[in-house]
Amino acid sequence: MPALATGSACDTGLYELLAALPAQLQPHVDSQEDLTFLWDMFGEKSLHSLVKIHEKLHYYEKQSPVPILHGAAALADDLADELQNKPPNSEIRELLKLLSKPNVKALLSVHDTVAQKSYDPVLPPMPDDIDDEEDSVKIIRLVKNREPLGATIKKDEQTGAITVARIMRGGAADRSGLIHVGDELREVNGIPVEDKRPEEIIQILSQSQGAITFKIIPSTKEEIPSKEGKIFIKALFDYDPKEDKAIPCKEAGLSFRKGDILQIMSQDDATWWQAKHEGDTNPRAGLIPSKHFQERRLALRRPEIVVQPLKLSNRKSSGFRRSFRLSRKDKKTNKSMYECKKSEQYDTADVPTYEEVTPYRRQTHDKYRLVVLVGPVGVGLNELKRKLLMSDTQHYGVTVPHTTRARRSQESDGVEYIFISKHLFETDVQNNKFIEYGEYKNNYYGTSIDSVRSVLAKNKVCLLDVQPHTVKHLRTLEFKPYVIFIKPPSIERLRETRKNAKIISSRDDQGTAKPFTEEDFQEMIKSAQIMESQYGHLFDKIIINDDLTVAFNELKTTFDKLETDAHWVPVSWLHS
């Protein structure tokens, strides 16, 4: 806080005025007693002290110190919650102890009260004996500075009255506690609003700075205080309120990107929730479409779309299935577990909206999270996985695929493949024991759920690459998968960096390598775009494989953080 000035020319002038007043008033005073009273009053030390205090406060108001934030207490609570998820050490324990002290909490609360100017007197409740037929008018004066008022209004189509539609959490109106949903607005700064449209009233409010005076008729409906705990959601789509024609007030909207974590501040409105970005120190909330409303309008907008597992072209594609032998040109090869029995689950993926999440940090006794790698053919996913395995064979592991193909002389059961009969394979398929499977040259190949469990049971990080539509079924409490999408660079960079590289061919069973073609590059880009468009909301991390070394280092850093830092995961994974 800036120090107050100790004196000014204005102070001296006022003191001289006080000293001169008795002499100036003497001709108008009838008795010596009255004159003595005036001399005593204007010479009183307490009066001079009050004048001095007035001058100091006047000087302080001119300085207008602006608080850095209005929600220090809430920020301290959020910090304490965040520290609870950090590995404990002496400094963290000391800080948590400090933040939990009552005097520190009280200090932060007082700071917020002053910063929010919430010290104005609150009007007493309306008397019980008031005449029901007589409207009780309330005059409210708010100081909003340059921030929005934090309330939306609407016009009642039947009565024509202008009423408060919603109060934005953390805004000036909410902090004042004087304006409530349903209050009828009669005047703004002395201007009657009965015959005005909401847009005109908003214009009046936007042009008003400093103090705003409202004349309102309080709503007779009693508000029920919200008792919601902290709710966090992960946004599964991009949103710009300026492009949304349905939002009641574009200025009150909150924009976000796919993958952003939002804190829900209010779900009172079934259509429009109030939220803010997680970690944002600004206490004001913004409007976002509710989950039900967003799902409904997206479903109505795209009724003709039926989500199907990702399919690539039927040309001779490059490469086998990565986790097991699989020709991409066979239309009936690529199947995922539950595809037949639970195909309706794909419908939900067509309209991704929000997912409730919570922080999760792996404890030392927990199994490692399953790492799922997704990417188009030729992007370098196999090479990245190979480099990871070579970097630490004791820490990383991969699944051994099952097959019905006959074992060759140089192969060992359980090393290259787990060899089983066709009957047993088909039985396991019926029992949903495969994550995904396919058929190649009349032989089945597949990755089983038990093979993933086997790697995790060895206290290793299981590296699994699958088709993107399979990811949905792996997102369970047991595996807690972390999904990484390996994305190709631009087609110009592909031409430049992959011109001498080769891709595995599917023309023979030996996996012959052949140079990349222009068609391979175009197919890679197209496939990546489809994957990101349809399944991007399931990806936790996107790594562009422009340079293999750079991509590998980024992947390694991501894994290190995954094992030590807290990450947002679906609530169902921890509360099932």
UniProtKB/Swiss-Prot annotation:
It holds the Pfam family SH3_1. Residues 10-65, 67-122 form the L27 domain. Keywords: Cell junction, Cell membrane, Cytoplasm, Membrane, Phosphoprotein, Repeat, SH3 domain, Tight junction. It is a peripheral membrane protein. SUPFAM superfamilies: L27 domain, P-loop containing nucleoside triphosphate hydrolases, PDZ domain-like, SH3-domain. Residues 139-220 form the PDZ domain. The modification Phosphoserine is found at residue 409. Transmembrane segments: none annotated. One of its GO terms (cellular component) is cell-cell junction. GO terms for molecular function: molecular adaptor activity; protein domain specific binding. Residues 289-383 are annotated as: Phospho-regulated basic and hydrophobic (PRBH) motif. The phospho-regulated basic and hydrophobic (PRBH) motif is sufficient and important for interaction with phospholipids permitting cortical localization. Phosphorylation of the PRBH motif by aPKC inhibits the association of the protein with the cortical membrane. Acts as an important adapter that promotes epithelial cell polarity and tight junction formation via its interaction with DLG1. Involved in the assembly of protein complexes at sites of cell-cell contact. This is MAGUK p55 subfamily member 7. It comes from Rattus norvegicus. The gene is Mpp7.
